[in-house]
Amino acid sequence: MTRIAYFGPEGTFTEMALLQCQDLAARGVMAVPGVELVGAERISAPSQVAALEMVADGAADLACVPIESSVEGPVTPTLDTLGFGAPLQIFAETDLAVAFSIASPKPLDEARTVGAYPVAAAQVRAWLAANMPQAQVVPAASNAAAALDVAEGRIDAGVTTALAARMYDVPEAATGVADVADARTRFVLCGKPGPAPARTGSDCTAVVIDVPSRPGSLALAMAEFALRGVDLTRIESRPKRTVFGSYVFHFDCVGHIDDPAVGEALRALHRVCDDVRFLGSWPRPGGPGTAPVDPGDSEEWFDGLRRGER
């Protein structure tokens, strides 16, 4: 049976994302080569890093982890583990609308403490100030743990998920709580390196590059995409943890490694960068950006020139 680790415990948004992936697989919308998602065993891990390391160590076949929030930006433990840890590859992604529930058995104006995972607290800070100004915010180990803390009487209210509130049988005193409307988080399924899912025409490719320490090296790496009409949709810098002021760069681009323009850009990066770590090509329906230019017309024209045609 397939084993999929996820950033737990049960009831977190990450488990909800994994359940969504399994539902998409059951409907034939999502697939990972050589892995059966439907009916897979879900294994809770205490952190994003732990979930990914379970895959690297062979304790799980895949890991489901958050990678980017529309409010808070990159999920750095995920980026750093993919960038510096044992080689892993992204095979699929999904995203969730992120709105919280306030779990509490008492009216909100009577709550004196409200537990929140730090990332969640940052996303509902204004709502709490407006609706629960009397409540002290205390840290929770996770979104689901906030509901458990309420159920066990350690706090009066918790910023949690609807799934966790139901799981621990705590009433939802408020739902749809978020400072930013339509906030979303991307989640990815990662496994050991292998063949990428087939090109769909609506794909994402990710790499981590280490460029030489000289003027213009990052601009040159970015130009390898621009000159080929490949749309970069995300660029993140992360410290290398070796020399102060040195960084690697995470690039997401529109397209698949089997797209000629993307393949050419990756080969060029290998020539101009000190290191290139391929994080995968996978379907991303409805993702941002513009698809790579089809080189077919220019290749036909060029081949005609070689044949002496004008």
List PLM regions with ranges.
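Domain-level signature for soluble enzymes in the chorismate/prephenate branch of the shikimate pathway
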Residues: M1-R310
